[in-house]
């Protein structure tokens, strides 16, 4: 006897039931309030926040996010936070869990206000843990004490993620190593030896394989810069995203066998944009998001992206996977009568100048060659016509020096005919970037590229959307996109045009009557160009050698 086979109708009914169950689960997750908890300076839980008046927490791509929490003055957590002398530690920490994402930060200030009606409220202000990266210096030699810093600068070349992580790790280890500095509590013997174990550090990072890192190469050079300042241009150039996670009780191990202390902040650098590979950068609603690869045109100035064939994206094959793959963005926020966009602001700035001028000082060696030629000619003339003991070359050079100095090979001008044709017959003409006072050098070439980039067209799109209409915001499989992901938005007046940019800011805010997300897509301050990256790497290498005293 054969087993009964499942009919097509039963299969379809099962798929429908599973889909509806998933929809109900996601709807329930979206309506769940955020889990807000306050912790003291040693990461002891002080309480779960409820009954707040309002709250707002912001994620900013590769920069410090801010948070505010307003509580009634009679709230027990408000009294605890405002009474700075009674609590054991001065610092107050906060964690906010919503849709798979965790916002964590440290209190930067507290204010007690009295309103016109006599009510008092306490406002707590926080900075997220991206701020910590602005307080970590990259020493010239992290393994030696401050009195002995040889070589002069910390220099490292390699893939961007690996190089930045190694620079961060060495200086985290320096901060926790008690060989040359006192621990926080010198009387605690365990702090003299236990800090060699990264699980006990307040800040750590995920490891990175050198051979497995395919991010763009860079030159890291620092002489006591902050890690944030050191990393900012490299992160912007490669469109990488710094993330952090705060380990709390009940969380899974960050990686197998690693159990950090409660409250440890773990940093990572990830590529969520796919900018230097092939990714979505534009398109229309009829053909979808076009996948393109960056290409530098023959004139060395203009850039274009070439359309490439759509590859297979294995991440989207699983029916339970939720998110955006870096190489295949797919989320499209459309304007219209029935839309999840509650308000939006689209900003476009056209390109300005069609020619960039740099210079002011002659190329190295030019003034010296002219000076030597004048002195040689003067010496030969005086020896021939006056006598061998008469030397007029130096006199002539001194008199003529104000006339010839910085006149030959002192300026460079480069025009983009393509930009001129795109802008039309009437347009702005010339632009001179800052810090470009010497022509025909690596710095001048870099300044030209920076000039083109500073005057190119810019696109920014700020939207406020209703969560779950139809896309959800969240991380770690709880949302369709999050900070750093590339998503598309429709042009408000050109109905069929798609603008694809990175999510640069996320703002989660609520009060006693509303809840919502603000999304900022794109930025009017753009990253470096392709050739600028190459020149900056060479220039960084030269600067590193100069700091080391080699050049």
Where are these regions (language model features)?
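Beta-strand-rich assembly/attachment modules of structural machines
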Residues: 2-166
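Compact beta-rich and alpha/beta scaffold cores in large eukaryotic transport/transcription complexes
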Residues: 114-119, 125-127, 262-264, 268-281, ...
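An acidic/polar, Gly/Ser/Thr-rich interaction patch typically located in mid-to-C-terminal regions
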Residues: 53-85, 229, 278-281, 287-551
């Amino acid at each position: 006897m054969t087993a009964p086979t499942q009919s097509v109708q039963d299969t379809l009914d099962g798929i429908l039931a599973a889909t509806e169950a998933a929809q109900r689960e996601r709807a329930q997750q979206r309506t769940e309030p955020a889990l807000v908890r306050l912790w003291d300076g040693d990461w002891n839980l002080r309480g779960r926040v409820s009954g707040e008046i309002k709250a707002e927490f912001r994620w900013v791509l590769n920069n410090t996010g801010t948070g505010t929490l307003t509580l009634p003055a009679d709230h027990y957590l408000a009294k605890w936070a405002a009474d700075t002398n009674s609590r054991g530690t001065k610092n107050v920490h906060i964690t906010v869990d919503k849709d798979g994402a965790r916002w964590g930060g440290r209190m930067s200030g507290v204010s007690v206000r009295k309103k016109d009606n006599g009510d008092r409220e306490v406002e707590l202000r926080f900075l997220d843990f991206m701020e910590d990266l602005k307080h970590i210096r990259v020493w010239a030699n992290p393994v030696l004490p401050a009195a002995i810093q040889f070589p002069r600068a910390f220099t490292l070349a390699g893939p961007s993620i690996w190089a930045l992580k190694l620079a961060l790790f060495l200086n985290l280890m320096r901060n926790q190593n008690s060989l040359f500095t006192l621990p926080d509590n010198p009387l605690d013997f365990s702090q003299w030896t236990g800090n060699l174990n990264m699980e006990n550090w307040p800040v750590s990072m995920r490891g990175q394989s050198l051979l497995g890192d395919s991010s763009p190469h860079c030159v890291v050079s620092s002489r006591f810069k902050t890690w944030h300042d050191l990393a900012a241009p490299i992160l912007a150039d490669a469109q990488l995203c710094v993330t952090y996670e705060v380990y709390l009780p009940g969380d899974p191990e960050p990686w197998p066998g690693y159990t950090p202390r409660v409250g440890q902040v773990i940093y990572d650098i990830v590529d969520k944009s796919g900018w230097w590979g092939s990714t979505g950068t534009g398109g229309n609603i009829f053909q979808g998001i076009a996948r393109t690869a960056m290409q530098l045109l023959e004139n060395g100035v203009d850039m274009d992206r070439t359309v490439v064939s759509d590859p297979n994206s294995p991440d989207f094959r699983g029916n339970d996977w939720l998110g955006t793959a870096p190489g295949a963005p797919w989320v499209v926020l459309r304007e219209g009568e029935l839309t999840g966009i509650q308000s939006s602001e689209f900003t476009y700035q056209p390109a300005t100048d069609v020619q960039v001028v740099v210079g002011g000082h002659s190329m190295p060696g030019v003034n010296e060659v002219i000076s030597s030629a004048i002195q040689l000619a003067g010496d030969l003339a005086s020896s021939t016509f006056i006598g061998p003991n008469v030397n007029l070359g130096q006199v002539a050079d001194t008199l003529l020096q104000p006339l010839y100095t910085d006149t030959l090979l002192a300026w460079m001008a480069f025009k983009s005919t393509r930009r001129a044709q795109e802008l039309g017959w009437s347009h702005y003409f010339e632009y001179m970037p800052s810090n470009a006072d010497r022509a025909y050098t690596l710095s001048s070439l870099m300044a030209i590229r920076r000039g083109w980039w500073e005057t190119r067209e810019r696109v920014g799109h700020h939207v406020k959307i209703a969560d779950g209409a139809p896309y959800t915001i969240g991380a770690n499989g709880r949302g369709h996109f999050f900070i750093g992901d590339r998503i598309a938005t429709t042009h408000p007046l050109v109905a069929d045009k798609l603008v694809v940019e990175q999510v640069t800011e996320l703002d989660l805010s609520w009060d006693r009557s509303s809840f919502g997300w603000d999304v900022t897509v794109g930025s009017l301050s753009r990253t470096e160009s392709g050739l600028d990256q190459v020149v900056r790497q060479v220039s960084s290498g030269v600067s590193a050698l100069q700091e080391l005293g080699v050049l």
